[in-house]
Every structure is written in C-alpha cells, then in structure tokens.
C-alpha cells in the first residue's frame, strides 16, 4: 500500500501493516471478546476512514484501489449510505445484477469490482434512515454481495464514528484502517477520535494521510 500511494506524488508515507490471525478480539474498554468474521474469498480488508467530511477520503480510496488493481485482485465498497461518491467517481450509472442465490454482483471498471448504495438507489433519493436500518444495510453489503476471490477489499467509510463504523469494527475481520485528514486543527481532532475508535477494538491504524497539505 505504501508503494502504491507514492505513485501519486512525492510525499513521505509511513505505513506499517500488522497481520493478526486471531479473530476473537478483546476491546480496549474491557468488554467481552468480539467474534469478527472474514468475508469468504477476501484476503485483506482495509478501511479508509476520516473523522470529518470533505477531506478527500473517497478520492484517496478509489485511487488506492486503482493502484493496487494493477497487480492484485481488488474490490472497492462505498459504505457512505447518506452520500455515496463512487458512482460519480467511477462514472457508472447503472444497477448491479443478481445471482440465482439473490446476491448482488459487483460492477466492474478499471479492473476493479465496485459496489455502492448509489448503484441500487436508482432515483438518487436521499436516504432518510435511522441507525438500526443503516447498520442492517451495511451488513448486507458484506453478506449479500458476490465478491469472489479478492486480494484486497477497500472500504470507503462515511466520516465520523457512527453506526456504520461501529457495525464494521464489531463484526468484520479488518486487516487495518487508513485515516485521512487535512492540516486544519479541527480535522486533526476528529481524526484522532476515529483512530481511538479503531484502537479500542484492536484494529491497527496502518497509516495517516494528510491530504490538501499545500492549500
């Protein structure tokens, strides 16, 4: 991941990947162990997160996925239910098909398998949903999408530490997360909250990307 990110400019990127074989994770708050499940056929799951919106997280997600896809089998899942960006970033305006087992088939472009709530919300209507419904939709994207064999699944999370993020870290066996921020003090405070959330459930933060540094 570190080498792929360097292809997008001269910058100092420090990323350390830690591999954990234990799926039962003890949270930092002393809670009961969490049984986090892998996605069948997916080797590594990387969450791209931010504490604040508008920091370029979705742009970094698709560029990182595209760079990895040159040598690896890669999927990209846009989990921002309220404001999905992947349809516009990928230039896709169609709905995914379903298998005979009623699983969604990811759309393919740029040698990547792509899935977003924006692909199935044909009317582009705003999602006015409460937390429990959002959590169920998030879980469906893990269980009811036919990802096939992947080396990496990149997750583009919505900003903050809300229901989607909590559902994710509690139920999914993440390889790690990458935090995206900007130099402003408010953004840095929020990204620290996000990093603390991952730390409490022993999900390693692989790196922090400071975006828009020269603006």
Give the role of each language-model region.
Residues 121-168:
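Phosphate-binding/switch loop-helix module in NTP-utilizing enzymes
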Residues 151-152, 158-215:
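Conserved catalytic-core segment of NTP-binding enzymes
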